[in-house]
Amino acid sequence: MGGQIRIPDGIVFLNGIPVVVLEFKSAVKENTTIMDAYTQLTVRYRRDIPELFKYNAFLVISDGANNKYGSFFAPYDFFYAWRKIEADDKELDGISSLVTMVSGLFRKERLLAVLKDFIYFPDSSDRDTKIVCRYPQYFAATKLFENIKKHLKPEGDGKGGTYFGATGCGKSYTMLFLTRMLMKSPYFHSPTILLITDRTDLDDQLSKQFIASKKYIGDETVVSIDSREALRQELQGRTSGGVYLTTIQKFTEDLELLTDRTNVICISDEAHRSQINLDQKVKVTEDGVERKYGFAKYLHDSLPNATYVGFTGTPVDGTIEVFGPVVDSYTMTESVKDGITVNLVYDGRAAKVTLDQAKVKEIEDYYAQCAVEGANEHQIEESQKAVAHIDAIIGDPDRLRAVAEDFIRHYETRVSEGATVAGKAMFVCSNRKIAYDFYQIVVGLRPEWAEKKICPDGVELSDKEKKELKPIEKIKLI
């Protein structure tokens, strides 16, 4: 176009179709970088030879020492290295990462697998959205797929395996890739897949993503379940297919058998919390002994022949017992090195605790009474150790206010210095009540943080941005 010749450095053809375009720069030239290669592909070539990219799968930019790939529509920050040849290999950098990319990503059968199952387009989008898997997502999905086949009931034990992925590493896309592989595989005979979370906000996030991916998944029945009865109606009588998203709390003791089919796969997000409580709990009440099980017990009773897969950023013993051993992992160290998540740096900011003297006397009187009633010194000592961490101390109003004031000062200083990632911060409390009390104190000190806005004050937006952006508050309690 325009009478000018453009010659890309490399093109990978598949049956005559240009599926990958590569651009190379020299590592020894100080005035050129792979950022220049990115600009050349996504700006100049996009403008001058757009027909070349009609069937493009992804781009590669390289100077020999720095080697990255990514979607034609992706910003430069979303181009990543492929740092392994095989899943259990050690990650490699520098010139070695060129070998891992060529041997790991461009091996014939693997490139075909990536083209087939690991490039995602949403069903509809008002912008150019295309997601190409990263190497940890590819290895996690493929290893879980094979492990599910191995442990599928009735021949297997129904423990499809555990995936340990660092927080923020893209587990939801790994679930999406795995779901497509399961639905497209003749081996599973069009399985029914349940995606289960333990919080409504996680359920909403996954539901939005999966419902917008029906064509990619290969099943028009992708449904967010909002009640036990709706789940029963959807699953009973169904012989195959369907993707259902729900929360573990939908599974209570009044939920009867849903199906005894073996081609049912349950994928659990945050599989270290309420999704592993299979044991019976006994509680003595005024009316007698009360026996209860956790939500996970009722889930497994409702779907006795299902195969269970767990995704977690915090694997515990209970996770392994319910879902099986860790099949693949992607650690925080690896994620930071790949530029997926930011590094965590400890900055000690201990808050002094001063208790109301009335509370101190109340506690002392309690232990004196325990001794009178026959508690031995060991029992009293153990209880005193425990009370040092009770919520009455941690959630003391004076302490919470001091912590909130320090947090606000620290946060605002870091933002002004440009030391945060887009002004983001996360505050973790020991329980919901303390979190709520802390939230109320912060909002009282900074009421404007609770106001819903589409952007910070003073930031100018285009008309398009004003239409697309939705107002949100600066601080949110979850």
Segments predicted by a language model, with ranges:
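Conserved motor-coupling elements within RecA-like helicase/translocase cores
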Residues: 226-244, 257-261, 470
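Conserved structural-core and active-site-/substrate-pathway-adjacent residues in large, well-folded domains
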Residues: 22-23, 59-63, 137, 168, ...
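Signature of the SF2 helicase/ATPase Hel1-core->accessory helical subdomain module
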Residues: 34, 80, 252-253, 259-381
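Conserved helicase motor "Helicase C" RecA-like lobe of SF1/SF2 P-loop NTPases
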Residues: 432-477
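Conserved nucleotide-binding/hydrolysis micro-motifs of P-loop NTPases
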Residues: 19, 26-29, 65-68, 200-202, ...
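Interdomain helical connector at the RecA1-RecA2 junction of SF1/SF2 helicase-like NTPases
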Residues: 92, 320-422, 438-444, 450-455
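ATP-dependent helicase/translocase motor core
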Residues: 1-197, 201-217, 239, 243, ...
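Conserved helicase motor
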Residues: 200, 222-232, 247-253, 430-432, ...
